[in-house]
Amino acid sequence: MANSFREMLYWYRKIIDRKLPCVNVNIWRREIAYKANGICLNCLNECKVCPCDYCGIRHKCENCLNSDCFMNTNNEFNSHRWITFDEEPSQMVLFEYWIMYKDYFLSKFNYNYKAQLKILNMNKNRRFHINESKKKALSVPITSQYLKFKFNNKIYIMFGTFLTSKIQPWIQLKSLKVGYIQSLNVDRCAKLIATKGMFATNSFKSSCITEINARRPISECDYLIEACLCNENNEWKFSAVMGRDKIPVTKSLAMKYFCKNINTELFYYGHSKCHVVSECPRWNQQLRVLNASTLNIIFRRQFMNEVVEWFENFTQLTGMHYDFIKTCVYNKVIISHFRKEIEDYINSGKKISLSSVIPDGHALYTNIDILRISLMLAIDVALNRIESQQMDVL
């Protein structure tokens, strides 16, 4: 059984490129070239995976063979990093487990050690991109990313940083999915600030883009938004990346995107009862993403994810269509009144009543207080995120 630090190096082995050495059992050695055939669930890297002695699944690379299997619950690391559920866990449950994982990791990973401080120096002034097929980078593994897959009728959740964008399902694991705990920008160790280097957190990859209004195909760069911890005031700075261009996200521009995306959510909610075969603009192939730019879609998921989730849940409760109605049932009066309520709350703080969309006698009228309070809280979170964070070009 490896000791704590050696086990940490097995699990959090990070490499920048093929010319630099990788961390392996307290020593530095060069990366051996081999053909990758899967994702190692220990170092979360694209490797040549081998069968595990404990469970028989091919989920370990050659450098992680001595690490304990994720199914071995007796291991101290596994009890914090790997979580098993019988049913689909909620975001709040995942967040509680993630806090315990973060606290445990910081108690074991000491940046005062020379070997671990060397990892930070190698990461100095480098940005972490999700496109790891071209460039590999070091990153502190305390992020809001998690890996989820189903195996033997159980759901496994693993926290950590992923060094590849080519995660694919394989036969033994049934299904594999990369997710994010909300869109939180996670805490960093205080020792990072002392190095006076610029460190990037996990890049955000939106999965809701299906096409864009351009002749060129969608690339991975269209999904990125970079975040960096500023050493002067310890605040986060953001810049959206579209192609090769970095677009500054100022407070005024962020507020513009917020109002624009509120209208987008209202548009989709207003057409939620329209049948898929009707002549509704929501189902028009030319408006599949509502002519939204990549930056708008990334902004929705990065800064107002709670508002988007509220509209998604509210649509599921109220947006059932009828098969015998093949016409567009969009009601401009109701949506205009709903939009006016939201705008008044944003501008003057007037409480949202939801009386336009949930009239007296509606099936959801008994839960109207919960719905209106949750919407106002979601808007407050988005506005506080816009106001409190300094957003600029990295």
From Swiss-Prot:
Spans annotated as Important for cytoskeleton localization: 81-171
Keyword Repeat: no
Oligomeric form and interacting partners: Interacts (via C-terminus) with host IRF3; this interaction leads to IRF3 degradation. Interacts with host IRF7; this interaction leads to IRF7 degradation. Interacts with host CUL1 and CUL3.
Region called Interaction with host IRF3, residue ranges: 268-394
Region (Zinc-binding domain): 40-78
Family annotation (InterPro entries): Rotavirus_NSP1 (IPR002148)
Keywords recorded for this protein, A-Z: Host cytoplasm, Host cytoskeleton, Host-virus interaction, Inhibition of host innate immune response by virus, Inhibition of host IRF3 by virus, Inhibition of host IRF7 by virus, Inhibition of host RLR pathway by virus, Interferon antiviral system evasion, Metal-binding, RNA-binding, Viral immunoevasion
GO CC field: host cell cytoplasm; host cytoskeleton
Keyword Nucleotide-binding attached: no
Primary subcellular site in the record, as a coarse category: host cell
Highest taxon listed in the record's lineage: Viruses
Protein name: Non-structural protein 1
Domain comment quoted from the record: The integrity of the zinc-binding domain in NSP1 is important for degradation of host IRF3.
